[in-house]
């Protein structure tokens, strides 16, 4: 069991390197073993065990292999959403494909893509999602001041119009469960109809992921510092 866990940690670190995620934080300290909740499997760091590849059907094997594919790097390896989807590959395979399209093929500036993800993670208080994407957002050029507005739930002031529109839209969508006409009109003015649909789909995709992470109590990788403060 211990050897499997070490392999998974190593593979997830390699995946983060392949994705261009900064490794400064992990490299600056020696990981320490933490005590997991009693219902958490150490090899998956969630409430679900990590299936062996040979026990999966053909679709499950495709999902498994895609996680290890260097052409499709994940931020978390098997100790994250991908590990959860191995238990339902019929749902997981198309969901992961939609995530890939939204992240890589939809024409949205990378910093705004990551901002939309972070707004979603903050509104769902998803520690795993936030901690995975904060370094990516900064790498993609998101202003740290904008990041802090989302992180600490500050009022939006003196922010660029695109960032302001996304933050207001996401907060109303998830916090208020409705979007005011004037907020929608501003999104439409700034981005146009197609982009508003794509941004909404991106946020919905990560809201779905946040729910899955919460249900199965996905823990951070061993030695990973949580980056999202809880009120």
Residue locations for each model-derived region?
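Positively charged n-region of N-terminal signal peptides that target proteins for export
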Residues: 1-3
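Hydrophobic alpha-helical segments
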Residues: 17, 23-231
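Bacterial N-terminal signal peptides
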Residues: 5-15
